Structures are given as structure tokens and as C-alpha cells.
């Protein structure tokens, strides 16, 4: 079991104990890879000669993958033998000599895997290093940058080279990129600047990769747990007062990754997943975490990533009551509109026209997309589940005129609608309240507001 909440934990991250009611430090029966069937799938894992990568390769083999390639700089003979002994029907195993920081080496690896497998279903960017501890002013620039070279440039080069192989797989099949990140992406621990910067940047690379290739290729990041592997110098290198923190096993992350990619789960795209969370419980909360978009992207999901930065301001989990299965089902099946297209967000009349056009086709509104080029006037323009709840008495007639009176509000407020609904005198207070609720976050991509897509 990970350390309890009341114990000191220098690596306690956002949402560690809040996302699921149970947490784990070792694998558990519900995610046993032998219960899954990945027959016919092909997988490539980087940094697989030891530690987490080795465990992931073994977990995939136990799940029945047909082909598995592992990239590493060191020998993979012992891993090949272990895979053969662990499986009744061992997969085709391809050892690949790989330096993730070398573009030519990565390109050669992609060519080799493509020639042997033809396509790819899962890519795991696992290779990484910790680097030396030290204050920034005392650090060696080459050593400091080498950590980013391995932890960020490496996943970039590998993703760049292997995406074409993922795209060759059937659109209906599983196609995943899993980036092995770290809770360190969210922490600020002096003397670990290079490592934590690299992992924070890897989170952004994850969301961007998913934005560019999802939902066809689903990209998400994991925190594997705090395992005392070789990257830490092994268990003996952990100081006595921190040993209670480094308790997760490599098998936990290996089995967790296999469980997550065993089915197509578009809603995982762009997210950060902590492997200590109870994953069956997590996937059961899909309807709580995601809101399907109806008008333009029927199979897409609204961009509310749980990136773990501050769970208390994360719309994916804040203020949500536990729903019954039937309530969750209805929420998941519900379709919502997205207001898109060019308009002058400084003019209330144009905002009202846009809302009316949207609600003509669907009486519910999920999101009003603002113009990112005018942050002072449009700000974040996220509006989730509107109705007259917040302004029930004063603005009921106005909401009804917009056909929005039957929706539900979670508290999200956009600058202009705060002004419209609350009146100019209440605008500042309304915006401040929205910030307190943690809803004015994550500016929307410019292409979503400036794409030129207009409503019918």
C-alpha cells in the first residue's frame, strides 16, 4: 500500500488519493494480463532491458500479444528467455538496438520493426534517466541537458518515427502511444530541475500528440508509481526516511499499461494516469470524467483533461457527486453542442445569436469557444452544462428564450455570459467567483475558435 495521507511523502502528487477510493502498490487480480486477450497485436517498448520497461514487455507477453519488439542499448537475451518461459504461446520477439537520443538509430529501429511487423498497435516510450542531483547554478550544462535529451527528445524522435506504423493498423483496432512520465512533472523538488522539467514537458508532448493524431491514435501519460528501480540506484540507494515512499513494484506499472490499452478508450487521450489508482474503478468513471460532444464531433470528447496539476480546480473531478450506473449511462449518452465559428466576442448580441443558432439544433450547450487572440475580452470561454440554476429567478425568462432552461450548470462562467446574465455591476464578482471555483483554466486552442466553421 502507498504511504497513507498522514505520512510525510515528498513525492505526493495531485489526485493521489482522491481519484479512486482504492490505491495499490503492487499488481492485483483485476488487472492480471493473463485475463486479457491481445492476440494479433504488435507492441514496441523502449528502454526494455530492465526495470519498468522489462516488466511492461513481460506483461504484454502474458496478455498474448503476437509480436513484441523491445529497444535498448544493452543486451536483451535474458528478457527473451524470460518471455519464452512466462508464456504458453510466446510472442515473436524482436530485440532492437536503440539509442533514443540518436535520430539515425531511431529511424533504423522503425525500419526494422516495420519490416518485421508491418504495423504497430502499441508504442511505449519508457526509456528515461534521472540525472544528477544539484542546484541549477552548480550543474553541468551538458549533464543537465542530457536528461532532457533522453526524457523529452527521445520520446519525440521515437513517436515521430513510429507514428506511421501505428497509422497502418486498422482504425477499429487499438492504437496507442503510452508515455512513461512521473509524478515529478507536477512537483517542485530543488536539485531535480532537469528531471522534473523533462517530465513536465513530456506531459505537454503527450497532449499535443493526442491532439494531432487522436482519436485514431490515442496518446496518454502514466506515472508508474515510485519504484526503487535502477534509475534510482536500486533499493539500497533509497534513504531510510524515504523507503516508505518507494514501495510500488514494476509489475504494477506493467500490468496497468496492458490493462489500459487492452480496449479502445478514446477518453484516455491526452491524460495523465497514476498507476497506483484502482484502474477498474477509474474506467468505471468515464461518464464522470468525460462529456461527449455532439454537433461536430460525435465520437470526440470535450477537452477537459485531468492532468493532475491541481485536482481541486480540475473540472473533471471537482464537485461531481457519485452517480448511479443509470445516471452515468444517461450522462454518457447525452449529446451536447459546441458553439463554433467567428464572431466578435465583445458584442453581447453576437454571442446571443451564436447561442441561439446552436440551441436551435440541440437545447444543450457545452462550450462557447472564444477567440484566443483577445484574451482580455474573451478569456477562457468554457461553459459546461448551462441553465438557469445559478440565475434561477432573475434570468429565467432570458434562459428560456435561449432554450437552455432544462440543462444543468456546474458553475462554469465565461466572461461575457457573466456580464450578460449577472449585469455589469456583478461582472467582476462573477468572474472572481468562477476563478475561485477553478473553472477559468486551460485556454482553448486557437484553431477551435478561428477555424471558420459556422453553424447551419
Swiss-Prot record:
EC number(s) per entry: 1.1.1.-
Metabolic or biological pathway, per its Swiss-Prot or TrEMBL entry: Secondary metabolite biosynthesis
Protein induction: Expression is positively regulated by the azaterrilone A cluster-specific transcription factor tazR.
Keyword Oxidoreductase: yes
Short name of any one Pfam family annotated for the protein: adh_short
CDD domains from the UniProt entry: SDR_c (cd05233)
Keyword vocabulary terms for this entry: NADP, Oxidoreductase
Signal peptide (UniProt feature, chain positions): none
Active site, UniProt feature: 195, 199
GO terms of molecular function: oxidoreductase activity, acting on the CH-OH group of donors, NAD or NADP as acceptor
Record flagged with keyword Ribosomal protein: no
Job description of the protein: Short chain dehydrogenase; part of the gene cluster that mediates the biosynthesis of azaterrilone A and other azaphilones, a class of fungal metabolites characterized by a highly oxygenated pyrano-quinone bicyclic core and exhibiting a broad range of bioactivities. The first step of the pathway begins with the non-reducing polyketide synthase tazA that assembles one acetyl-CoA starter unit, five malonyl-CoA units, and catalyzes a series of Claisen condensations, methylation, PT-mediated cyclization, and finally releases the first hexaketide precursor through the R-domain.
Protein name (record): Short chain dehydrogenase tazN
Species of origin: Aspergillus terreus (strain NIH 2624 / FGSC A1156)
Amino acid at each position: 500500500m502507498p504511504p497513507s495521507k498522514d505520512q510525510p511523502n515528498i513525492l505526493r502528487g495531485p489526485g493521489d488519493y482522491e481519484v479512486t477510493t482504492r490505491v495499490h502498490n503492487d499488481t492485483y487480480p483485476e488487472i492480471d494480463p493473463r485475463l486479457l486477450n491481445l492476440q494479433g497485436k504488435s507492441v514496441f517498448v523502449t528502454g526494455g532491458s530492465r526495470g519498468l520497461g522489462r516488466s511492461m514487455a513481460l506483461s504484454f507477453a502474458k496478455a498474448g500479444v503476437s509480436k513484441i519488439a523491445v529497444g535498448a542499448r544493452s543486451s536483451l537475451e535474458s528478457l527473451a528467455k524470460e518471455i519464452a518461459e512466462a508464456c504458453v504461446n510466446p510472442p515473436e520477439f524482436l530485440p532492437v538496438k536503440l539509442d533514443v537520443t540518436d535520430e539515425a538509430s531511431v529511424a533504423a529501429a522503425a525500419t526494422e520493426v516495420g519490416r518485421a511487423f508491418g504495423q504497430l498497435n502499441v508504442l511505449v516510450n519508457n526509456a528515461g534517466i534521472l540525472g544528477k542531483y544539484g542546484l541549477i547554478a552548480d550543474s553541468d550544462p551538458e549533464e543537465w541537458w542530457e536528461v532532457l535529451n533522453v526524457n523529452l527528445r527521445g520520446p519525440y524522435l521515437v513517436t515521430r518515427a513510429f507514428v506511421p506504423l501505428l497509422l497502418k493498423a486498422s482504425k477499429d483496432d487499438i492504437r496507442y502511444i503510452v508515455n512513461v512520465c512521473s509524478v515529478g512533472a507536477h512537483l517542485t523538488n530543488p536539485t531535480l530541475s532537469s528531471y522534473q522539467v523533462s517530465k513536465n514537458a513530456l506531459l505537454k508532448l503527450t497532449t499535443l500528440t493526442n491532439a494531432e493524431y487522436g482519436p485514431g491514435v490515442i496518446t496518454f501519460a502514466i506515472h508508474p508509481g515510485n519504484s526503487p528501480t535502477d534509475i534510482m540506484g536500486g533499493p539500497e540507494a533509497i534513504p531510510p526516511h524515504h523507503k516508505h515512499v518507494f514501495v510500488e513494484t514494476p509489475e504494477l506499472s506493467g500490468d496497468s499499461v496492458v490493462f489500459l490499452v487492452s480496449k479502445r478508450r478514446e477518453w484516455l487521450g491526452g491524460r495523465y494516469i497514476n498507476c497506483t489508482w484502482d484502474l477498474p474503478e477509474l474506467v468505471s468513471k468515464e461518464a464522470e470524467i468525460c462529456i461527449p460532444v455532439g454537433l461536430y464531433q460525435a465520437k470526440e470528447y470535450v477537452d477537459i483533461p485531468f492532468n493532475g496539476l491541481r485536482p481541486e480546480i480540475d473540472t473533471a473531478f471537482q464537485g461531481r457527486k457519485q452517480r448511479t450506473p443509470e445516471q452515468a449511462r444517461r450522462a454518457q449518452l447525452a449529446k451536447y453542442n459546441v458553439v463554433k465559428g467567428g464572431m466578435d466576442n465583445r458584442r453581447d448580441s453576437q454571442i446571443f445569436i451564436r447561442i441561439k443558432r446552436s440551441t436551435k439544433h440541440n437545447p444543450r450547450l457545452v462550450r462557447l469557444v472564444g477567440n484566443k487572440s483577445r484574451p482580455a475580452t474573451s478569456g477562457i470561454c468554457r461553459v459546461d452544462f448551462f441553465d438557469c440554476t445559478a440565475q434561477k429567478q432573475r434570468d429565467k425568462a432570458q434562459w428560456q428564450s435561449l432554450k437552455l432552461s432544462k440543462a444543468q450548470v456546474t458553475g462554469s462562467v465565461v466572461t461575457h455570459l457573466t456580464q450578460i446574465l449577472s449585469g455589469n455591476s456583478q461582472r467582476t464578482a462573477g468572474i472572481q467567483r468562477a476563478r475561485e471555483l477553478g473553472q477559468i483554466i486551460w485556454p482553448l486552442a486557437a484553431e477551435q475558435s478561428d477555424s471558420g466553421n459556422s453553424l447551419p
